């Protein structure tokens, strides 16, 4: 049994979607970041960086923060969606790290400046929107000749998809990136994605282009 500490953010949805895909039993603990629940002492014991998501694996008592580390752990624990060795494993981790270092922080800045503070910092808006489109272009090129980023559906797709699901927040038209659009809609139809998207609470249907 996994205890999942999460909220309705792209990083949080990575893990709820993954747990559904892995078929692992889990208990959800909502951490409402709008109420600063992530800085409560009891949560800091699990996630010293006071960020969601975090997990505790009751099978062995292990607690983990950082969504990328959690995805690798769950992949290794179950033997699913993360190859055990060889190039396939490292391609999967490569694209997981791409998400952690690219779309995660950069699209997060787009949300901050474009959605929540539009007009307050034109330079920042221009900079991060430009980077958002560059990243979408990288992903579109990667998907030009393959169904998923590491060929087979993997934890890398689970990491990237929730950030693309906020394409409207990013003022991105997925029609500009047809390979991303095809990939996005394919994954959006997966039952585990539909279910995991609504954890820890239902805030609406999966956005569709």
Regions found by a protein language model. Give the residues of each.
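Positions that flank functional sites
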Residues: 33-34, 182, 202
